[in-house]
Amino acid sequence: MSLNGVAAKSCTCLAVQADGAEITTVEGLAKGGELHPLQEAFWNKHGLQCGFCTPGMILASHELLRTNPDPSEDEIRHALEGNMCRCTGYQNIVRAVKEAAATMKGGAQ
């Protein structure tokens, strides 16, 4: 989840910490029925499989791209290192973040 615009682990956030805060979940990224570029890229690049890690991966990526719109592969991997995925091997997730960054800058990759 995003807590006041900063990525946070919902599993370790107490309700009292979230009281009065602006909270965004992965579902809140989509606007007007259209997927956010990160959601679209995860779909296009097969960055999701079982879906367990997907919300955390997408929200951590969203935070990264908010602060660094053109991250290197190493920067992406560093930003995602707290999120564990047992299905994809991470390469497609990194590709998805790169594609989303390009899309969000107005280009294509």
Per-region residue spans from a language model:
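Signature of N-terminal electron-transfer/Fe-S-associated modules in redox systems
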Residues: M1-Q109
